[in-house]
Amino acid sequence: MESVEKEDSLTAPFEFATTASTDAANAPTTFPVEAPPLEEEEVIIEQDPGFVSEDDEDRSVPTEDKKQDQDDAEANEEQVGRGDQRHGDYLDVGDDVLLKHLQRQCAIICDALQERSDVPLAIADVSLAYERHLFSPRVPPKRQENGTCEPNPRLNFYPVFAVPEVLATYHIFFQNCKIPLSCRANRSRADKQLALRQGAVIPDIASLDEVPKIFEGLGRDEKRAANALQQENSENESHCGVLVELEGDNARLAVLKRSIEVTHFAYPALNLPPKVMSTVMSELIVRRARPLERDANLQEQTEEGLPAVGDEQLARWLETREPADLEERRKLMMAAVLVTVELECMQRFFADPEMQRKLEETLHYTFRQGYVRQACKISNVELCNLVSYLGILHENRLGQNVLHSTLKGEARRDYVRDCVYLFLCYTWQTAMGVWQQCLEERNLKELQKLLKQNLKDLWTAFNERSVAAHLADIIFPERLLKTLQQGLPDFTSQSMLQNFRNFILERSGILPATCCALPSDFVPIKYRECPPPLWGHCYLLQLANYLAYHSDIMEDVSGDGLLECHCRCNLCTPHRSLVCNSQLLSESQIIGTFELQGPSPDEKSAAPGLKLTPGLWTSAYLRKFVPEDYHAHEIRFYEDQSRPPNAELTACVITQGHILGQLQAINKARQEFLLRKGRGVYLDPQSGEELNPIPPPPQPYQQPRALASQDGTQKEAAAAAAATHGRGGILGQSGRGGFGRGGGDDGRLGQPRRSFRGRRGVRRNTVTLGRIPLAGAPEIGNRSQHRYNLRSSGAAGTACSPTQP
């Protein structure tokens, strides 16, 4: 019954249907429908043997035939197996390819555990070792020619949307505290108060002696919304959240306050490195208490928990023994260490003109603004896809940099202000993380020595700001400041900031998908309305607002044509603006249109040349910066000034104006020559209009009927007079008689004989000058305007080379 089994198999080949077999007499006379017909030589006449027993069947079949049948059956089974492998699962060829995924992941885990002496048993230890091997390897990744690091295939096995803990060494820490009632969300006029105009200066820091009283209430100027009061009275219970519905709330805040009820928020940690702060507190304020050991002597007296400076010593330094004066000095020192020195370090880091320039340049990449947008357009390369972290450059094409363009008005300003605020928090946290990781025990001991040497100067300083400035000189030296400023900020995208925003909101117990909250909504906008622990966030919010206006990101001032990438900030206007810098515009128009070849030093080597390519021009354009016209600490747009720029406006590569003018004239003459002599239809690359349209064929001139009849009468009279006078006719009609060479057979004057072709078969056209055109008659155009019937196989731009005529 071998044939029946083969028929039931869907993957078995059909060769058995055309092959004769010795047991065909015992098989039923059925064939598959798909089997081809047998040829005449292979047709077997089957006979019905009737009922036979197994013994008779065995005796009737020879032994050699049985062996042949077994061999055929085994061959057919092997063939069926090969057919199943060919037509079935294609993954089982050789080794199972599905095991490669596990093999690769096991190899990565083995590499991660090689540095450990024992194999960790906890999942957290394995995960930590795995993340350190992926994101913090001992050997840094190789750098490619374009500046980015090579792709790491090991990252394919890490969860895509998970935040690795080993990277977020400082970003995962938060300062959980109560939201002040005077936060920005409870100030309906916050957008007007934060608006900056021409002449606004960079914000400054504050101290507790300058702001002695702090108001955290709602204020008299704010009025609750009427529907919020009705809802509170109807429910007969007080509002348990901090956010209050106000009359002047915008649509976003109104929806937010009805969506959530919060009292606390997780503010990103902005503290100085814990190692530094622990050392400063122990040497200046109070001695640090260490955990007790088993063998420690409890009767032994130590300085742990005691003030770093006793009352007797402080009284000798201050030359007073009044308890109130001593207590006031201790409060001043505590405020300077916990609050003001942090603000002092922030201001030194962010307010530096060079650092501010780098911050604004990074914001131009983040928001695809101004000169960065112009460079992307000319180079045809999306430069905003570049992101970096700790000096390593990556190309990420999944990031978004144009999300802010979908917003208008106050919604756009709130979003941009929040993005810049998060960008500053992110940058400061990155700097603090690097600072924390670089410190070792010997550095902390050296810091203790410096603090002990300057202990008296710190406690006897003039005021809180002077104490903070002196302390910042010790713990935040100039070398450390310059090193961090050179490596930061990192290039970020709006997608990265959005992930950071969601990370903060989730840690605060706010679901981002159900509300439209921004982290900056919970930060007060003034120092006198903000608790001192949040003064760092208040300063960063004010600085973010200033940078957003100084970079001209708050409003969209772009337009059409040359104004497509226009930006009013000092980084773009006037030196990088195609609108204000005419030489830069001329240089951008001749990109790729010429190549200057210099004299070769010898006959063998090629001569050095200059070819203005888009890449060369873009590189020089991005590097172009004029510090004389950059006003870091004041909003001073070039458009709002009546004075000329301090530096001369020049191009990027070709800075000599006369050379640039010659190249521009050559390019213009070449384009005009192509329009006149070239073949094809030339299109404007910007508008798409034809630069050399084919004029319509001229229409024959038709005189009015009255003039035509009058002209015909005059011609008939002239012909009769010519026939009367004979050869020569009237004066001035020489050689146009009936018998002259110009006369026709009909005797009419001025009609040359058409059958005769002399040396002037085609006569010149005569143009009458000074004649007043008749009404309705077409004007005669300029003779220098030639008409060409141009044929084109495709649309060509002004920069392409047409076919030679």
UniProtKB/Swiss-Prot annotation:
One term of GO molecular function: RNA binding
Keywords from the named record: Chaperone, Eukaryotic host gene expression shutoff by virus, Eukaryotic host translation shutoff by virus, Host cytoplasm, Host gene expression shutoff by virus, Host-virus interaction, Inhibition of eukaryotic host translation factors by virus, Late protein, Methylation, Phosphoprotein, RNA-binding, Translational shunt, Transport
CC terms in the record's Gene Ontology section: host cell; host cell cytoplasm
Residue intervals of the RRM domain: 348-466
Biased composition (Polar residues): 18-29
Region entry Disordered, spans: 1-88, 684-805
Subcellular location, record wording: Host cytoplasm
Post-translational modification summary for this protein: Might be cleaved by the viral protease. Phosphorylated. Tyrosine phosphorylation enhances preferential binding to tripartite leader mRNAs and allows ribosome shunting.
A Pfam match: Adeno_100
UniProt feature, compositional bias: Basic and acidic residues: 59-70, 79-88
Predominant location: host cell
Modified residues (Phosphotyrosine): 365, 682
Basic residues biased stretches: 754-763
Bias (Gly residues): 726-742
Binding to host EIF4G: annotated span: 280-345
InterPro entries from the UniProt entry: L4
Domain of life: Viruses
Induction of its expression: Expressed in the late phase of the viral replicative cycle.
GO BP annotations listed: intracellular transport of viral protein in host cell; symbiont-mediated suppression of host gene expression; symbiont-mediated suppression of host translation initiation; viral translational shunt
Family, as annotated: Belongs to the adenoviridae shutoff protein family.
Binding partners and assembly: Monomer. Interacts with hexon protein; this interaction allows chaperoning and trimerization of hexon proteins. Interacts (via N-terminus) with host initiation factor EIF4G (via C-terminus). Interacts (via RRM domain) with viral mRNAs that contain the tripartite leader; this interaction allows ribosome shunting and expression of viral late mRNAs.
Additional facts recorded: All late proteins expressed from the major late promoter are produced by alternative splicing and alternative polyadenylation of the same gene giving rise to non-overlapping ORFs. A leader sequence is present in the N-terminus of all these mRNAs and is recognized by the viral shutoff protein to provide expression although conventional translation via ribosome scanning from the cap has been shut off in the host cell.
The protein's role, per its UniProt record: Protein that inhibits host translation while promoting late viral translation by ribosome shunting. Blocks host cap-dependent translation by binding to eIF4G, displacing MKNK1 from cap initiation complexes and preventing EIF4E phosphorylation. Binds to the tripartite leader sequence of viral late mRNAs and recruits host eIF4G, PABPC1/poly-A binding protein and 40S ribosomes subunits on viral mRNAs, allowing ribosome shunting and efficient translation of late viral mRNAs even though conventional translation via ribosome scanning from the cap has been shut off in the host cell.
UniProt-recorded name of the protein: Shutoff protein
Gene source species: Human adenovirus C serotype 2
Gene: L4
